[in-house]
Structure formats: structure tokens, C-alpha cells
Amino acid sequence: MRAAGILTPGALWAPGPSDTRDERRHDAGRLQPALPGDGRGPLRPGVTRMEGLLHASSVAQQGAGALSGRGERASGSRGTDGGHVGTPGGSDPARGPRFDLRITPGGYLWWYLDALSDDGDHGLTIIAMLGSVFSPYYAWARRRGNPDPLNHCALNVALYGKAGKRWTMTERGRKALRQAPGRLDIGPSHLTWDGTALTIDVNEITAPIPSRVRGRIRVIPAAVNAREFTLDPAERHVWWPIAPISRVEVDLEKPALRWSGHGYLDSNRGEEPLEDAFQCWDWSRANTPSGTTMLYDVTARHGTGASLALRFNASGEVEEFPPPPRVRLPTTGIWRIKRGTQCEAGHQARVVETLEDTPFYARSLVETRLAGETATCVHESLSLDRFASPVVQLMLPFRMPRVGG
């Protein structure tokens, strides 16, 4: 998982994109006053070029039944709890995503894509969310005793790079949702799995200043990983790194943008709100000569969370290795988000650049030493204690309008 595009210090009054013109009239009559929202922090334009640093996640899921399926314990988990490993329950993972799964009331399911162009000039993040985890509307519904996840859906799109920054996260209700095994419709946007590739047709409006984001993204996995990992002792939260190595083709009409590059797909699902199970986590991934290396270190609210260190190759095979010692990183400069990572003894980890500094989420470039290789990672820190605070909750609505229905 990860959160993305969330409330950077200037996000509430961010400069508007250049392509506003008449697109703002679309959907305008149906938007309720913008409320908070966010998902996961896109890299800002103008950061250090990051050829080969693929970060992301999203897509694919398991069989048609309820969200279930447990696995054997991961050898890399800390203590005796968390970090279990197994095959996605009720499905053939080689067949790709299933979009018709049932979700526990109060729970969530998302598919996440992150990609970077081959020249390092452009990037994107897309999250298709059912039971939007950072939605204030969903939180209010849970408090009222009506926690219907399918009434709180969104397609979060973040574009960054030379063409400028775009960010969308319009929440939609149950009437705007259509689910089939190989297709998911959220309002005017949809995701389709054809057996070999994922196609995402985007038709969304940016916030807070409206402009259109429209076009097609194709994701071609090198292979589909067959293992999933539980993140909490109760096994209610599951992470599936579906395709850590993928090719991505971007063809957008608005803004006019065409590029191809490398990407990463995963999916997260849970049977309760994230903040009920976790205090915080650090997550990172990097391309290395041996493949894609990933670290996921979770602090559970009760018991022991997962501590995972994984290597993936282009064939989709995953190898666990013992997590290196945990080290502290400097807190972020504005919102003072705590950060940490793992690094082999005798070496030092360092923050190369802070990309996003928000009230409860930070995204950074971090250099560390993993499995005998120096790696520059895209790194994320999420504080769910911060997220759950009343002050932060009041901030969230400015980036997430909701369409009724």
C-alpha cells in the first residue's frame, strides 16, 4: 500500500494546472463542497531524476469469494506475529485481478499503480479504491453505523513531471460503481484486465482547481507474483505485491502526454479501518541489479506487526531475506513525520531528498545498503496516529470532492 498525494504544506492552496479552460464545467453541478482526501504522495515536478527507481503499487486480486485466505508464516516476520505469507485465497493469481470481490463492512480494497518514464521526466500514481481509506465521508458513515465500503469509491490519479502536476480524487457512491471479474467501473473511469495486461481508462477532474485528466494507461506485468503477506497479528490486513516489475504505457489526451516506462503493481485489502490496526509503517522499494527489493515495516496497534524484506526477479519469484537492522532517519522538516528504514551493519542510510511532507505522510528518496547492494529507495512513512487526530481530519476534505449517488 501506501498513502499518496496527501496534503503537502501548499496543497490546500496549490497553484492551479495550466490546462483549466472549459473542462471545469464537467461534473460541476454534482460536486458537493470539497472535503478532505488523499491517498498517496506523487513525486513533485523538478525533483532529482530517478531513472530506474520504480515505486508503486496496485492491481490484481484474488478469487470471487469474500476477502479471505491465509498463508504460512513468513520467515522474515518479527517475533511470532504478522508477516504471514501465502497464495492469494480463492483465486488463480496468474489470471490477474478480480474486481468483483466482496468487502467486509468498514473494510477496504484498493489496487495501486506507480510508474516512472524511461527518461525519468514523468511519473504517475493511480489508486482504485473501494472503501476509500482516507475518506472523511467513509469515516463519518462508520461513526453513524452505516459502513458500506461500496458507497465510498474513488480513482485517485496523480501526475508529476515536466508536463506539470495533476491530482484527482473524486469520491463516488454505490450507484457509480460497476463490478465484474475482469472490469471495474468507478464513475466515468474504468479498469479492465484482459488476461495479460491491465488497461486503465481515466476520465477525472482535478482538485482543488478543476481541469480534466483523460486518457489511457496500460500495464504489462513481467510476471504475476503468487504470494501475499498479512500485515497484522489478527491477519485482517493483507498486502499482495502483484507485479513488482511491469512495463507501463501512458497515452493521455488531457493533459497531452505520452510516455512509456517501468511500473509496479500491488493491492491491499482489510477488514477494518487502517488506523484501528496500525500506529505507523515505513515502506520502501528499489531497483537493484538483482531485481526489485522491498521493505515493509509495520508497527501494529496491538501485538507485533510485519517486518518484511523481499527480493523479486523478472520471473515473479520472491525471495525473503533477513531484514537488516532498523535505523532512524531525520524527521521531515515541516510536519516532523518520523522516518526509519533498514540498513546493513557498517553502512549508513541517508535521506537523499524529501519529496512529500504532509501532516501524516512523508515520501522520500533514501539511500541504504541491502543484501550487499547500495540501493536508492523510494520510501514512505505513514503515521496513522496523526491521521486519526481531529485536527488532521478537518484538513482532509479540501482535496476530495464527493459526487452524490
UniProtKB/Swiss-Prot annotation:
GO biological process: carotenoid metabolic process; chlorophyll biosynthetic process; photosynthesis; spheroidene biosynthetic process
UniProt xrefs under SUPFAM superfamilies: AttH-like
Keyword Protein biosynthesis: no
UniProt name for this protein: Acyclic carotenoid 1,2-hydratase
Biased composition (Basic and acidic residues): 19-29
Keyword annotations: Carotenoid biosynthesis, Chlorophyll biosynthesis, Lyase, Photosynthesis
Compositionally biased spans, kind Gly residues: 79-89
Summary of temperature dependence: Optimum temperature is 30 degrees Celsius. Enzyme activity is significantly lower at 20 degrees Celsius and 40 degrees Celsius.
Region (Disordered) location: 1-47, 61-98
pH dependence: Optimum pH is 8. No activity is detected at pH 4.0-5.0. At higher pH values, it shows rapid decrease in activity, although 50% of the relative activity is still detected at pH 9.0. It retains much residual activity after 30 minutes incubation at pH 4.0-8.0, indicating that CrtC is stable in both slightly alkaline and acid environments.
Reaction(s) catalysed by this chain's protein: rhodopin = all-trans-lycopene + H2O; 1,1'-dihydroxy-1,1',2,2'-tetrahydrolycopene = rhodopin + H2O
MF (Gene Ontology): hydro-lyase activity
EC number: 4.2.1.131
Coiled coil: none
Low complexity bias (residue ranges): 33-46
Induction (UniProt): Repressed by oxygen.
Organism: Thiocapsa roseopersicina
Function: Involved in the biosynthesis of carotenoids spirilloxanthin. Catalyzes the hydration of lycopene to the corresponding hydroxylated carotenoids 1-HO-lycopene and 1,1'-(HO)2-lycopene. Can also act on geranylgeraniol.
Family: Belongs to the CrtC hydratase family.
